[in-house]
Amino acid sequence: MMKKRTLGCICGGLLLGAFLYWQNNGLILTKMTYRGEIPAGFDGYKILQIADLQNKVFGRRQEPLLRKIEQSCPDIIVISGDLVDRHENRTDVDGAMEFIHALVTYAPVYFVSGNHEHQSGEWEILEEALVEAGVTVLNNGKSVIERNGDTITLLGLADK
């Protein structure tokens, strides 16, 4: 009886560990179709949103993540905060920018900062690097996108 209980606990622990690993390292692409009113020129328009990476690394040079992004063929990419981790010893602006330099080759990139950017102490450096890479930073701003004679407006509200 004790051996079965011990074996059950070990198996349960292994399953829990595998689940937690997958939760933190799995890449999931969720597709959503907006059913509200949009201009006809934007029919079929794909917006890929990335949030809360917090300097997480998915494979060598983010290759698994970049493959998923490339396969989705987005018209634009929107990063809605927390690209970097706010903790002093884990904020990696260079690593984040390596990812950004790859992203801008797929589609125009728009960025709104999150609390991690502002609390990292590296926001000014990151913002300058993003702009230099061709990213549109929308902190408390907007950008009008035109397609097939129609327009939509992206709004960004910074999280401080």
Protein language model regions, located:
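Active-site-proximal loop/helix segment associated with metal-binding centers of metalloenzymes
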Residues: 156-160
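N-terminal active-site segment of His-dependent metallophosphoesterases
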Residues: 13-99
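Core catalytic region of metal-dependent phosphoesterases/phosphodiesterases
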Residues: 61-146
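Short amphipathic, positively biased membrane-proximal segments
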Residues: 1-14
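Short strand-coil-strand connectors
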Residues: 41, 146-148
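Conserved beta-strand elements of the Class I
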Residues: 48, 153-155
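Short acidic/polar mixed-charge low-complexity motifs
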Residues: 45, 150-151
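Conserved hydrophobic/aromatic beta-strand scaffold that supports enzyme active sites
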Residues: 29-33, 142, 154
